[in-house]
Regions:
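An N-terminal assembly and electron-transfer interface module characteristic of large anaerobic redox
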Residues: 1-155
Length: 155
């Protein structure tokens, strides 16, 4: 991860100007089931998508659905940040999108099940408010899929 002190001044100032509000000490919702019963989805800000889904652009607040059965070889990355080193993703997609690992957790009964669809956003360039509409859409889709919890991989 790049340190703020390593960035050019203009970029450091841009990031510091975002000044997001703290999330606070409490969780958004209390878990009512043991982890071994949870249906879990993946959400990433790595800007990944299937080859046929279309690339993300820098100011893109949309999302791309990724099926739980998607093969890693058919997932590509169009994350636009020049500060993001993609070599880990190229080596192993599980670095940014642990699809194989979550299936292993389900097979070993550590979690209840894997959601039918996971979601990817492009996490660079926009204020959080820009994602409000698509976040509400994805939340509705997760509810339809009976998802209990999400593993977020912020990139």
């Amino acid at each position: 991860m790049v340190k703020l002190t390593d960035l050019p001044e203009y970029e450091r100032e841009h990031l510091l100007s975002k000044n997001g509000s703290p999330l606070g000490p409490s969780v958004w919702t209390d878990r009512k089931k043991p982890v071994s019963d949870l249906r879990i989805a993946l959400i990433t800000t790595a800007g990944i998508h299937t080859r046929d889904a279309g690339a993300f652009n820098f100011t893109d607040a949309s999302y791309r659905p990724i099926s739980k059965d998607q093969k890693a070889k058919d997932i590509v990355m169009s994350h636009s940040s020049v500060n993001f080193d993609k070599s880990g993703f190229v080596e192993d997609i599980n670095v940014v999108f642990p699809l194989d690992r979550i299936h292993e957790l389900a097979q070993s009964k550590k979690i209840g099940s894997v959601a039918d669809v996971h979601y990817s956003f492009m996490g660079a360039g926009l204020e959080p408010e820009a994602f409000e509409q698509t976040a509400v859409q994805v939340a509705g889709l997760l509810k339809q899929d009976r998802v209990d919890a999400v593993l977020l991989t912020p990139v």
